[in-house]
Amino acid sequence: MTALRFPLLAAAASLSLAGCWYSSSVSGSRDGTNTMRAIDTANATTSPQQAEAFISGKTWRSTESSSGQHIHYSAPDGRDFAWFRGEERILAGEWRIETATDSRGQAVTRLCLRYPGETVHPISKTAGDQWYCRAAGSVFHGIPERANGDVLGLAGRTQAPFALTLSNLTIAQLKARANPPANR
């Protein structure tokens, strides 16, 4: 009887404690709870109009990728020009905003990117012509900086101005390095 009591007690305890990490009232921001709640809120409340306004006609810098930052210019007509770490050229692709259903059946606004000229999509590692879509709030959480217009001239370039590294440079730092003043 004693041998059965402890495994049953352990099983009951683990079932009752499952999921406490995320919903614990004593959790602080160090464990990621506040960040996850902010992303969940952004995913639930970002409208398609807000998502489009966030990136349309903007140069934006994403730092969420484990492979380092990537820089985009998302033109208002749906074209996307992307500069990825390790790439010697600017990738020409497309962006769109769509509404889909999440795992709980709730409507969620998504940002989708694809690069039809590429064999492999630089983010998802699937076929380049396949749309890679993520909840807009999640994507925007990893974008620390945006600038109006094509401030790095990505739409007019085929070659990257220099190789991006793992270090996160600001848009101003990237611009200064990509377009150095002429020597006099």
Place the predicted regions along the sequence by residue.
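C-terminal motif of bacterial Sec signal peptides marking the signal peptidase cleavage site
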Residues: 16-19
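Lipid interaction determinants
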Residues: 21-92, 98-184
